[in-house]
Amino acid sequence: MTNYRVESSSGRAARKMRLALMGPAFIAAIGYIDPGNFATNIQAGASFGYQLLWVVVWANLMAMLIQILSAKLGIATGKNLAEQIRDHYPRPFVWFYWVQAEIIAMATDLAEFIGAAIGFKLILGVSLLQGAVLTGIATFLILMLQRRGQKPLEKVIGGLLLFVAAAYIVELIFSQPNLAQLGKGMVIPSLPTSEAVFLAAGVLGATIMPHVIYLHSSLTQHLHGGSRQQRYSATKWDVAIAMTIAGFVNLAMMATAAAAFHFSGHTGVADLDEAYLTLQPLLSHAAATVFGLSLVAAGLSSTVVGTLAGQVVMQGFIRFHIPLWVRRTVTMLPSFIVILMGLDPTRILVMSQVLLSFGIALALVPLLIFTSDSKLMGDLVNSKRVKQTGWVIVVLVVALNIWLLVGTALGL
């Protein structure tokens, strides 16, 4: 009886610690459902129905492993990826890494900020510029939570992630997808045309986000409580739950687009405004409103995460710190310039995703090198199987993103 009580007490303590350590992966997972994912998944679903759902499944599994490695680096070393690169590589190399990471963080923020502004425009009927002003105000308010520590921000970001997931449960109910075809699309790989290959590369490029790789290692580097192995075990649960939710949202986005657009003959739906306007007569005004709200929630939360990632990148690479509100102000400027110049926001959004693809391998390669170093990682070093899987992901991501870049350059 005494042994049972001890085991029960230790079990409760383990669960309590696991819950206390949950949160960082929910911040990271927001990067996987930003407006870039909305645009890519909608286009893929409208064009090819359920045939590219398997790409979302595999991209999400890859992303899970990458985020676990990033989180593990922070737990094992007490330093984030940017700091490790700074400590192990020559200064010119570090400065190059910092510049490209900042450019990629700003490109990411551009897509996320404009995505949220489009969401406000759609649901409130305001101009894109007014939507951008509302986005700026909202992100400043959310970032103010950082003054109270990481936990309040984790709760808000996690809440927004769950809201987007709930919104897409509603969208699935409205669109009523064919479950048998949906399941087949998730399991059986299919690339029927060269455009499908191009869109598959786009889905992968929009899913694995370099700025989140840097950020996640910083979110776990100061975790306390329990042993390193216990913190790592709790983090794996954190990543599994958060990334499963993000994966569901991406699947639901594509499945909704397939059911609502592809099978009703609207295969050319390619941008967010068009998707919103097309949803109204096909499903209902309520479905279109839910879509707009989910776009706002995803855009706001992901642009906040992008700001935090930019801060980590600057602090880690060059040991320089600026207040978050200053960084937020500076990174908003390109979005306002794009809007004031009257450029096509969806095209800018897609171009930013292409730019992002340059940074994926640059973040992945050092992450794999560091997490495979037994002197650095100790008992948390990568196993042989994880190393091999990691390098396969690197090769695949680089190959598909080269395809994406070449296809974009040639106008394929």
From Swiss-Prot:
**Which ranges does the record list as Periplasmic topological domains?**
40-51, 119-125, 176-196, 259-276, 345-350, 407-412
- Recorded GO CC terms: plasma membrane
InterPro entries, sorted: NRAMP_fam
A molecular function (GO) held by this record is: cadmium ion transmembrane transporter activity
Q: How does it sit in the membrane?
A: Multi-pass membrane protein
Membrane spanning residue stretches: 20-39, 52-71, 96-118, 126-145, 156-175, 197-220, 239-258, 277-297, 328-344, 351-370, 388-406
Among the record's GO biological process terms, what is one?
iron ion transmembrane transport
Which is an annotated Pfam family here?
Nramp
Task: Show which residues sit on the Cytoplasmic side of the membrane.
Answer: 1-19, 72-95, 146-155, 221-238, 298-327, 371-387
- Enumerate the UniProt keywords alphabetically: Cell inner membrane, Cell membrane, Ion transport, Membrane, Symport, Transmembrane, Transmembrane helix, Transport
Q: What is this protein's function per UniProt?
A: H(+)-stimulated, divalent metal cation uptake system.
Q: Which family does it belong to?
A: Belongs to the NRAMP family.
Question: By what name is this protein known?
Answer: Divalent metal cation transporter MntH
The keyword Mitochondrion appears for this protein: no
| Subcellular locations according to the entry | Cell inner membrane
Query: Where primarily located?
Result: membrane
Superkingdom, according to UniProt?
A: Bacteria
